[in-house]
């Protein structure tokens, strides 16, 4: 078993979660493909690690909303995935490396979440846990995240 000081294969396992200050958006990883494609993964942290977390229905609904809406603002988005610790999401993009633009896209997306009238694909045909959604909860998360927009670049460390 590896100790806390041993370098791990997973980038986020090497992040000292006691030294970050949520909410924030940070570049978690960059990978170059053999043909020159660039994959950039962002750590989009909503809650302070080990102190608070998102409840599952709200997180689940925000996942659906952002996954659908963000693509209206950026065609380079590959994925928007929740973290198992329920403190944030990973945003993965292809051939795009402009941090400032990512912040703008996230801001526009969260503003659109606040205007949403339903959670997309929140039915049994399109979702594996359709009963586990709350539009109000997702909007509350988006509102809280947006209210600290000026802090997104302040990671702590």
Curated annotation (Swiss-Prot):
* Cited PANTHER family: S-RIBOSYLHOMOCYSTEINE LYASE
UniProt GO BP: quorum sensing
- Describe the reaction catalysed, as an equation: S-(5-deoxy-D-ribos-5-yl)-L-homocysteine = (S)-4,5-dihydroxypentane-2,3-dione + L-homocysteine
What enzyme category does the UniProt record give? lyase
Which cofactors does it use? Fe cation
Keyword terms, alphabetized: Autoinducer synthesis, Iron, Lyase, Metal-binding, Quorum sensing
Q: Tell me the residue numbers annotated for binding Fe cation.
A: 60, 64, 127
User: What HAMAP family does this protein's entry cite?
Assistant: LuxS
What family classification does the UniProt entry report for this protein?
Answer: Belongs to the LuxS family.
Job of this protein: Involved in the synthesis of autoinducer 2 (AI-2) which is secreted by bacteria and is used to communicate both the cell density and the metabolic potential of the environment. The regulation of gene expression in response to changes in cell density is called quorum sensing. Catalyzes the transformation of S-ribosylhomocysteine (RHC) to homocysteine (HC) and 4,5-dihydroxy-2,3-pentadione (DPD).
- EC number from the UniProt entry: 4.4.1.21
Pfam families recorded: LuxS
State the free-text cofactor note: Binds 1 Fe cation per subunit.
Coiled coil start-end = none
Gene Ontology terms, MF aspect: iron ion binding; S-ribosylhomocysteine lyase activity
- Protein name as it appears in the record: S-ribosylhomocysteine lyase
Q: How does it assemble?
A: Homodimer.
Domain of life, per UniProt, equals: Bacteria
